[in-house]
């Protein structure tokens, strides 16, 4: 293919990493949750846009993968929380194959976190509590959008939103849709990546063993 113009070949793009502080076994926290909390706090303080954006990877029963960017809505020692329409592409894949991965691409700080694990639905009380905290426009949007369904045009979505706005007019409380809710990814592996010079990056992974303990492993970059 003859490509002309100002296109820059991806192979010519270079970025040298030179972290002031490497990631070592001595400065790593004692557990994945504390380490993630430390880095997440630093990302927020640094003012990165959408610091809670993460790439969610799923696969169907046949092993065909898909990925998309979603927003982290909570984390604790039990795992990472997100919300979606259960009938969406990711929702149906998680129902069929309840294992997933998360990637937090914090490249402005020369960092990345990769998480793998099993995914469970949140109980209804947790979903409803979070839904009640959402802006009203987002609540209406959850009712209006049959996520991942093919639409004939943009007007169909706008019309559905207006219909929901009329249905719940005058400040009527908006309940969580029955097909909308949360998932918690319970990690069995959490890798922390810190960029370093000469592509000799630091990769330290917390991995859950069959016995339920956690071990720390250094991975080759």
Swiss-Prot record:
PROSITE patterns: PYRIDOX_OXIDASE (PS01064)
Pathways per UniProt: Cofactor metabolism; pyridoxal 5'-phosphate salvage; pyridoxal 5'-phosphate from pyridoxamine 5'-phosphate: step 1/1; Cofactor metabolism; pyridoxal 5'-phosphate salvage; pyridoxal 5'-phosphate from pyridoxine 5'-phosphate: step 1/1
Residues annotated for substrate binding in this entry: 14-17, 73, 130, 134, 138, 199-201
Binding site for FMN: 68-73, 83-84, 90, 112, 147-148, 193, 203
Cofactor note: Binds 1 FMN per subunit.
Classification via Pfam families: PNP_phzG_C (PF10590), PNPOx_N (PF01243)
UniProt record similarity statement: Belongs to the pyridoxamine 5'-phosphate oxidase family.
Quaternary context: Homodimer.
Name of the protein in its database record: Pyridoxine/pyridoxamine 5'-phosphate oxidase
Biological source species: Salinispora arenicola (strain CNS-205)
